[in-house]
A protein has these predicted regions:
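Phosphate/NTP-binding elements of NTP-utilizing enzymes
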Residues: 1-209
Length: 209
C-alpha cells in the first residue's frame, strides 16, 4: 500500500498551531500567511492517522473551496496515496477509508447529517454566523470531533466574538499572527504595498495562547 509522507517541514508559527493539543483552535492571520495550506495539512495528517475518519474543509462558498483549496489538497496527497478521487464532490478517500471533503458554507443543508472527526472552517469571519453553532458544532458531538477556524479579521463581528470567548475556555487555543510572520511575503513587498495603499496595515499583533 502506498504510504503518504507526513514529514512536512512546518514554519515555527505553523508548528505552534499544528502541535496544539486543544480540541478547538482559532487562527487569525493576515492574508498570504499560509493558513489554508496548514489547515488542509492538518486534515491530511489526521485522516491518515486512523481509519474511517471523516474530515471536512468548509470555505465560505463551494466556488472558493474548489478554486483554492482543492488544488492544494491534491498537491498534498499524491495520487498513489489515494484510493479514490471525486472531482465532482471534491473528495479524496485514502487507503485507510478516511475521507477528506471540501464544502461551501453557502449551501449549509448539504453539510447536515454527517458525523465529523475533524473540520476546518476557512475564513469564518466571512461566513453566516450560524454556520458554526447551528450546523457544524452538532456534527462533532457524537465523535467528539476537533475543529480549526482560520480567517483574516473582518472587524468586531462574530469571528472576533468567538475568538474572545475562546480565550477564556480551557479546550480552546487562540493564535494571532501578522502576514509577515508567515514567511511567504517579504518585508520589502509589504512596505511597497503599504506605500501604494496606505489603508493596508499590519493585520495584528502576534499573540498566542
Amino acid at each position: 500500500m502506498p504510504v503518504l509522507d507526513l514529514c512536512q517541514k512546518l514554519r515555527p508559527n505553523q508548528a505552534s498551531v499544528f502541535t496544539s493539543q486543544k480540541r478547538f483552535r482559532i487562527v487569525v492571520t493576515g492574508r498570504r500567511w499560509g493558513k489554508t495550506w496548514l489547515a488542509l495539512w492538518w486534515l491530511v495528517v489526521n485522516a491518515s492517522s486512523g481509519p474511517n475518519r471523516t474530515c471536512y474543509f468548509i470555505a465560505p462558498s463551494y466556488r472558493q473551496a474548489k478554486r483554492i483549496a482543492w488544488r492544494i489538497l491534491k498537491q498534498q496527497i499524491p495520487a498513489a496515496a489515494r484510493r479514490k478521487t471525486n472531482e465532482q464532490e471534491l473528495s479524496i478517500e485514502l487507503h485507510n477509508s478516511s475521507i477528506i471533503q471540501l464544502h461551501g458554507a453557502d449551501h449549509p443543508d448539504s453539510l447536515r447529517g454527517v458525523g465529523l472527526d475533524f473540520v476546518v472552517l476557512d475564513e469564518y469571519a466571512f461566513m453566516d454566523p450560524e454556520t458554526w453553532p447551528m450546523v457544524v458544532r452538532p456534527m462533532l458531538s457524537d465523535r467528539r470531533g476537533c475543529a480549526m477556524f482560520i480567517s483574516s479579521p473582518s472587524g468586531l463581528n462574530h469571528f472576533y466574538e468567538l475568538y474572545m470567548v475562546a480565550k477564556t475556555r480551557n479546550d480552546w487555543a487562540t493564535f494571532h499572527f501578522r502576514t509577515e510572520e508567515g514567511g511567504y511575503v517579504t518585508m520589502d513587498e509589504l512596505a511597497s504595498m503599504r506605500a501604494e495603499s496606505p489603508v493596508i496595515q499590519p493585520c495584528c499583533i502576534s499573540e498566542q495562547s
